[in-house]
Swiss-Prot record:
GO biological process, one term: one-carbon metabolic process
Keywords: ATP-binding, Cytoplasm, Magnesium, Metal-binding, Nucleotide-binding, One-carbon metabolism, Potassium, Transferase
Gene: metK
Top-level taxon: Bacteria
Subunit structure of this chain's protein: Homotetramer; dimer of dimers.
Lineage: Bacteria, Pseudomonadati, Pseudomonadota, Gammaproteobacteria, Cellvibrionales
InterPro entries per record: ADOMET_SYNTHASE_CS (IPR022631), S-AdoMet_synt_C (IPR022630), S-AdoMet_synt_central (IPR022629), S-AdoMet_synt_N (IPR022628), S-AdoMet_synthetase (IPR002133), S-AdoMet_synthetase_sfam (IPR022636)
Catalytic reaction(s) noted: L-methionine + ATP + H2O = S-adenosyl-L-methionine + phosphate + diphosphate
An annotated GO cellular component: cytoplasm
SUPFAM superfamilies hit by this protein: S-adenosylmethionine synthetase
Name this polypeptide is given: S-adenosylmethionine synthase
Organism listed in the record: Teredinibacter turnerae (strain ATCC 39867 / T7901)
EC number(s) reported in the record: 2.5.1.6
Residues that, per the record, bind K(+): 44
Family of the protein in this entry: Belongs to the AdoMet synthase family.
Spans annotated as Flexible loop: 100-110
Length: 384
């Protein structure tokens, strides 16, 4: 973190239209994997006023009632009435899903005594830092927690005036590579008509910002921007078209680490865009948990149809306790980063993905999120 004295990250709530699309895509993936763990799935979603469109490629032996599923996801998020601008019970649902290309399947499927090839070429990054307990960058971690708290209060009825769409942004000041103060915080929440800005400001400050952000980081010069436009009644898919895969920085490290460009949601684990990024997080987190470095970024790359990664590289940004090249050797020794290997290592052929589609794929230590486990830390620590 030595290259920055101030750093900003943002997050969005589950009711943001792009996150709606991600959740729908991952709900479709989960429903298919539940009955067919060997299915091939690549599903994209678009949501706009009065409609949800799903498209993509699938190969599966199971049947899913997509219309009912998609409606339920929208209702679960909180879009259940025309009063909030979108109603999962009455919106149009359009299905444009086709079959997976036989050419792609040929390169990816396992033949007898042969490793599964990568589902596509590409490069993926994993990252960890010891600036938070969950080994995530603090700006993105707290940005997620703010909008997660907004949703919690909305759903509980404590903020009955609040609506599903919301965004947050946190700017932290760093000293010697560690966060020490909040320079600015932004929280915009969609709301019902007739609610005063004074009421919104007080509720957001006292019941969202102060309970979430560390008190010692808030100071007299911290800048607070709560619904800075003054009104946020029109939101969700009415305000903006939502698409799967448009929040890839929100999904990962808030811009503090590099990104290979591939989105996650709607993709089964044979797509290394997703599975290798999860494995990269697992590797980097274990390296930092082991004390081999304060910060660690790993890059892996693949060729379609080829099992072995075309490259593995590690950067500890000068914080490593041993040489980065030695860490690469430890990674190759203790982590199987072939597509089949990382799927088995992290038990990814499960219907666990809808939970990942809001509030961050990384830094949430849920039982299903195997890539957050630090079970390799002890064996890596032996290298010190």
């Amino acid at each position: 973190m030595s290259e920055y004295s101030i750093f900003t990250s943002e997050s969005v709530s589950e009711g943001h239209p792009d996150k709606m699309a991600d959740q729908i895509s991952d709900a479709v993936l989960d429903a298919i994997l539940k009955d067919d763990k060997h299915a091939r799935v690549a599903v994209e979603t678009l949501v706009k006023t009065g409609m949800a469109i799903v498209a993509g490629e699938v190969r599966t032996s199971t049947y899913v009632d997509l219309e009912d599923l998609i409606r339920q996801v929208i209702l679960d998020i909180g879009y259940n009435s025309s009063d909030v601008g979108f109603d999962g019970a009455s919106c149009a649902v359009i299905n444009a899903i086709g079959k997976q290309s036989a050419d792609i399947a040929m390169g990816v499927d396992e033949a007898e005594n042969k490793d599964m090839g990568a589902g596509d070429q590409g490069l993926m990054f994993g990252y960890a830092t010891n600036e938070t307990d969950v080994l995530m960058p603090a700006p993105i971690y707290y940005s997620h927690r703010l909008v997660e708290k907004q949703a919690e209060l909305r759903k509980s009825g404590a903020h009955a005036w609040s609506r599903p769409d919301a965004k947050s942004q946190v700017t932290l000041r760093y000293e010697n590579g560690k966060p020490v103060a909040v320079d600015a915080v932004v929280l915009s929440t969609q709301h019902a008509p007739g609610v005063s800005q004074a009421q919104i400001h007080e509720a957001v400050m006292e019941e969202i910002i102060k309970p979430v952000l560390p008190a010692e980081w808030l100071h007299s010069n911290t800048k607070y921007h709560i619904n800075p436009t003054g009104q946020f009644i029109i939101g969700g898919p009415v305000g903006d078209c939502g698409l799967t895969g448009r929040k890839i920085i929100v999904d990962t490290y808030g811009g503090m680490a590099r990104h290979g460009g591939g989105a996650f949601s709607g993709k089964d684990p044979s797509k290394v865009d997703r599975s290798a990024a999860y494995a990269g997080r697992y590797v980097a987190k274990n390296i930092v948990a082991a004390g081999l470095a304060d910060r660690c970024e790993i890059q892996v790359s693949y060729a379609i149809g080829v099992a072995e990664p075309t490259s593995i590289s590690v950067n500890t940004f000068g914080t490593g306790k041993i040489d980065d090249g030695k860490i690469v050797e430890l990674v190759k020794e203790h982590f199987d980063l072939r597509p089949r290997g990382l799927i088995e290592m992290l038990d990814l052929m499960r219907p666990i993905y809808r939970k990942t589609a809001a509030y961050g794929h990384f830094g949430r230590e849920l039982p299903e999120f195997t890539w957050e486990i630090t079970d390799k830390a002890d064996v890596l620590k032996a290298a010190l």
